[in-house]
Amino acid sequence: MAVISKKIPAPDKVEIKTALISVFDKTGIVDLARALSARGVRLLSTGGTFKAITAAGLAVTDVSEITGFPEIMDGRVKTLHPTVHGGLLAIRDDSEHQDAMKQHGIEGIDLAVINLYPFEEVRAAGGDYPTTVENIDIGGPAMIRASAKNHAYVTTLTDPADYAELLEQLSADDGKTAYTFRQRMAAKAYARTAAYDAMISNWFAETLSIDTPRHRVIGGALKEEMRYGENPHQKAAFYVTGEKRPGVSTAALLQGKQLSYNNINDTDAAYELVAEFLPEKAPACAIIKHANPCGVATGSSLVEAYRRALACDSVSAFGGIIALNQTLDAETAEEIVKLFTEVIIAPDVTEEAKAIVARKPNLRLLSAGGLPDPRAVGLTAKTVSGGLLVQSRDNGMVEDLELKVVTRRAPTAQELDDMKFAFKVGKHVKSNAVVYAKDGQTAGIGAGQMSRVDSARIAALKAEEAAKALGLAVPMTHGSAVASEAFLPFADGLLSMIAAGATAVIQPGGSMRDQEVIDAANEHGVAMVFTGMRHFRH
C-alpha cells in the first residue's frame, strides 16, 4: 500500500506572531486575547469572537480581510479557504511551501484557538432534527485538525483550561512555545474532534435507528483521573459521554473523598437497580457490593425500606453502596451512618440529612438530581481483545410483559407482586441469578454461579443466616416468590427453590425441558409464570 511520506523537522521553540481565534465558548477568551495583544501578537478572528474581542477595545483582523472573501450562508462558510488552511498547514522550513505562501499571499498562523458549536449540549437538551444538524461544526474541526497536524510549528488550543499554561510558556520563553507543549495540545485536539465526531455519528445512528453502523466510535470527555483502577496496579480515569442520564456521571458529590473506580462501577449498578422502583409508588432502597445487590426492599417510608434492605444480608452490606429512589431525609440518614458505608446516592438530599452524614466525613454522598428512566434506550459497551461489544441497554420492564401462567395454580395477587419484585432485582444480579422475595423485600440473593442450582442454594443459605440474625423462626424464603433471570434448564433448580420454601416462581421459560419443570411445579402445588424475556448479566 502506498503511503504519504515526508520528514518534517520539529523546532523546539516556535514564536507566536499570529493567532487565529474562533470560539463558541468564549470563557476567558478576552483575557487571552488581551494578553496576546500585549505581546504584539497579531489577532485574526471570525463572527461572534471577532465582535467580543473588538468590544474589549483590542485590535483584531476579521478573517474575511485576509481571505478577500466574506462570510456567506449564515456563517457556514468563513474559514474554509486556502489562505486560512495554508497558513495553518505550511511547513515553515520547506522551500516549496514558502514559495507557495509568497505566491498566494498566505501568512503563517502560529496559534489556533478553536472550540466548537455545542452539538453535545443541543443533543442532550433534545433539540429537534434541524437544530441539531445546524449545530454540527464544520470549519472548527477542519482548523483544529489542520493546525494539530502541523504541530511542529503551530500551537492548537481547544480547551479554555489550557490558556493559562500557554501564557506561562510565552512568559518563560520570550513569546515561544515548546515542542512538547504543542505535541500535547495536538493530541488533545485530535481527541476532541474524535469525540465530537463520535457524538454526531452516534446521534445519526440513534435517530435513524441504525443498530449496527459500519463504524462505531464511543467518545467521552475526561471527568477525572483516578488514583488507580479496579486494583492498585491498574491505571484508570473516568470519562463522561454527554448522555444526560441521572446517575453517577451527572451526580454532585456533596461530601467525601473522590470516588474510586470500584465506587463508580458499584454506584452505577446500585442506582440503575433502585430506579426500577417508581418513587411515586413506594420508597425503595438497594444495597450493593461488587456490583451485585445484597439487599433490596420497598417500605412505607424510606427509612423502613433501608432497614428491610439491610435485613436481607447485613454482613455483606458492610462497606457497601446505598441507593435510594427518593430524597434522603434525616431519619434515614441517621440509620445509614450507623453502618460503615462507602457511598450514598439519592435523587436529592435534605439539609438535615447532609448535616447528619457530615458526621462521617469519609462517607461519599451523591445527589443525582433525578432517577434514570429504566425504559430509556441507550447503549452499553464492553471491550474484548481487539474489539468492542456494543448492545442496546437492557430496558425490558416486567410491567410491560405479558406474563403467562403455565401451571395449574395461578399465583395469588401477593405472589404476583413478589414475583415482579424479584424479577426486577434479578435483572441486576450477575448470572446465574436467583432472587427470593417476600412482601417487597429480598429474602435471599444468589449471584454469579456457574450452576443455577448453586445460586438457588446460596440464596437460601443467605436467607437462613438472615433469619438467625433477626431471630426469626423460619427464613423469609418460606412462602416467598423466586425469580430466575434465565430459564430453568432442569427441574433440579426448581426443586431447590421449593425446598427453600418458595411457593411461586417467575422465569423467562424457553428451555427444551420446560414441561419437565412445569410438571414438577404442579406436583408441588407451586405457581409459575413465564415472562418470555431473559436478563443475562455478565
Curated annotation (Swiss-Prot):
Catalytic activity: (6R)-10-formyltetrahydrofolate + 5-amino-1-(5-phospho-beta-D-ribosyl)imidazole-4-carboxamide = 5-formamido-1-(5-phospho-D-ribosyl)imidazole-4-carboxamide + (6S)-5,6,7,8-tetrahydrofolate; IMP + H2O = 5-formamido-1-(5-phospho-D-ribosyl)imidazole-4-carboxamide
BP term (GO), one: 'de novo' IMP biosynthetic process
SUPFAM superfamilies, alphabetized: Cytidine deaminase-like, Methylglyoxal synthase-like
GO MF term set: IMP cyclohydrolase activity; phosphoribosylaminoimidazolecarboxamide formyltransferase activity
EC number: 2.1.2.3, 3.5.4.10
Keywords, in A-Z order: Hydrolase, Multifunctional enzyme, Purine biosynthesis, Transferase
CDD domains: IMPCH
Recorded superkingdom: Bacteria
Pathway given in the UniProt record: Purine metabolism; IMP biosynthesis via de novo pathway; 5-formamido-1-(5-phospho-D-ribosyl)imidazole-4-carboxamide from 5-amino-1-(5-phospho-D-ribosyl)imidazole-4-carboxamide (10-formyl THF route): step 1/1; Purine metabolism; IMP biosynthesis via de novo pathway; IMP from 5-formamido-1-(5-phospho-D-ribosyl)imidazole-4-carboxamide: step 1/1
Disulfide bonds: none
Gene Ontology CC terms, in alphabetical order: cytosol
Residue ranges of domain MGS-like in the record: 8-158
Domain notes: The IMP cyclohydrolase activity resides in the N-terminal region.
Family, per entry: Belongs to the PurH family.
Full protein name: Bifunctional purine biosynthesis protein PurH
Gene label: purH
